[in-house]
């Protein structure tokens, strides 16, 4: 991997390698873009095949956070950390204390959070060394479980997509096929049920399915059958890449709007659903409620204020679909354009984030 060529191609700012022999820490912090503010992104712990795979993942995820934060209207850039190791057996307190000191050394250019393989408890340990961490225990003034807030954002985004497809944002009487009934999807189902939608659900966890059936009168189907259901809206809320060659030809929905990450297996599948006339709410725009919520901690968390910001996902999806129509491009490209246009507007007056008295961090 020609590292500097790759960083130059996608305009990365900084890559930080963190090592602590005593604790076993091997971490890579990638900072993609700080035009809008300090880089916010979680810390992932994973058993990577090799160091190059870890570097590539950190870079890819950091760039994704730039777009997610920008499209969400946050005054934050994009970053990400990967820690090389098995989260089930390689963790120790010293590791996260050492990592916290590395974050502190960046003086606010990067703020971390929980991600795959890390926990709230890990964030609390990091917090012993630095304030540049979010998603810590509620006792320290954090926002707590993000699932209900993420679900509310998906619900708002789904209504905006429904308005584009059906001429009204009312979901009453609409049939919605929800794939996955985990914490976020369960809360989404609650909102949909309260508005009078008809729910079809599936999950590999039979208990989760049964709970949705009992609580919301949902109809359960086998996991492989969810794509072919007669429904108005398909809501992918489990694994990624469920919009692919096999599933697209089965879809009968007019709208795709759900909480899952990386819903398109390949970008060409986004082109396909656009050509089919399906209204698509891009994943990183519609599921941004979690990051919007956690970002509010930087101001001193206020649940009412955070929820008000999450309501804005409705308008964000509207803008994405307007750009899609304006420029004649698929929604996934329109989401990228929304983020890029916002960054470019700010770039004219600001090139790189440095800690000073006029950033989000000065309000902590």
UniProtKB/Swiss-Prot annotation:
**To which pathway does this protein belong?**
Amino-acid degradation; L-leucine degradation; 4-methyl-2-oxopentanoate from L-leucine (dehydrogenase route): step 1/1
Pfam families cross-referenced by the UniProt entry: ELFV_dehydrog, ELFV_dehydrog_N
Give the residues annotated as active site: 80
Which parts pass through the membrane?
Answer: none
Q: Name one GO biological process term.
A: L-leucine catabolic process
Question: What EC numbers are recorded for this enzyme?
Answer: 1.4.1.9
Any one Gene Ontology MF annotation carried by this entry is: L-leucine dehydrogenase activity
Q: Which Gene3D superfamilies match?
A: Leucine Dehydrogenase, chain A, domain 1, NAD(P)-binding Rossmann-like Domain
Annotated residues that bind NAD(+) are located at 180-186
Q: Does the record bear Kinase in its keywords? A: no
Lineage, top-rank taxon, reads Bacteria
Concerning CDD domains, the annotation shows: NAD_bind_Leu_Phe_Val_DH (cd01075)
* Annotated family: Belongs to the Glu/Leu/Phe/Val dehydrogenases family.
Described function? Catalyzes the reversible deamination of L-leucine to 4-methyl-2-oxopentanoate.
The molecule here is called: Leucine dehydrogenase
Give the species: Bacillus subtilis (strain 168)
Phylogenetic classification of the source organism: Bacteria, Bacillati, Bacillota, Bacilli, Bacillales
């Amino acid at each position: 991997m020609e590292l500097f060529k790759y960083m130059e191609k996608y305009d990365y700012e900084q890559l930080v390698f963190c090592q602590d022999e005593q604790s076993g820490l091997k971490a890579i912090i990638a900072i993609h873009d700080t035009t809008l503010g300090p880089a916010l992104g979680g810390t992932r712990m994973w058993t990577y095949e090799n160091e190059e795979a870890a570097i590539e993942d950190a870079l890819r995820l950091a760039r994704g956070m730039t777009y997610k934060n920008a499209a969400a209207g946050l005054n934050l850039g994009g970053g990400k950390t990967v820690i090389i190791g098995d989260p089930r057996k390689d963790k120790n307190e010293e590791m996260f204390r050492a990592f916290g000191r590395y974050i502190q050394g960046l003086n606010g250019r990067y703020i971390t959070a929980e991600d795959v393989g890390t926990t709230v408890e890990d964030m609390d340990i990091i917090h012993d060394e630095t304030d540049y961490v979010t998603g810590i225990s509620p006792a320290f003034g954090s926002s707590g479980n993000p699932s209900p807030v993420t679900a509310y954002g998906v619900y708002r985004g789904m209504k905006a997509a429904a308005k584009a497809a059906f001429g009204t944002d009312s979901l009453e009487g609409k049939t919605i096929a929800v794939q996955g009934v985990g914490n976020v999807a369960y809360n989404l189902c609650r909102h949909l049920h309260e508005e009078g939608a008809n729910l079809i659900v599936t999950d590999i966890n039979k208990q989760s399915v049964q709970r949705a059936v009992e609580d919301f009168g949902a109809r359960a189907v086998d996991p492989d059958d969810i794509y072919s259901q007669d429904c108005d809206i398909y809501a992918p809320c489990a694994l990624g890449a469920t919009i692919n060659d096999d599933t697209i030809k089965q879809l009968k929905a007019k709208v795709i709007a759900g909480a899952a990450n990386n819903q398109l297996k390949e970008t060409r599948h986004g082109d396909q659903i656009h050509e089919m006339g399906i209204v698509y709410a891009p994943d990183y725009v519609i599921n941004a409620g979690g990051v919007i919520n956690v970002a509010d901690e930087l101001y001193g968390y206020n649940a009412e204020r955070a929820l008000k910001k999450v309501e804005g996902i409705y308008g964000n999806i509207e803008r994405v679909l307007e750009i899609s129509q304006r420029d004649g491009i698929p929604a996934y490209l329109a989401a990228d354009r929304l983020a890029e246009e916002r960054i470019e507007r700010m770039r004219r007056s600001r090139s790189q984030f440095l800690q000073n008295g006029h950033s989000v961090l000065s309000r902590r």
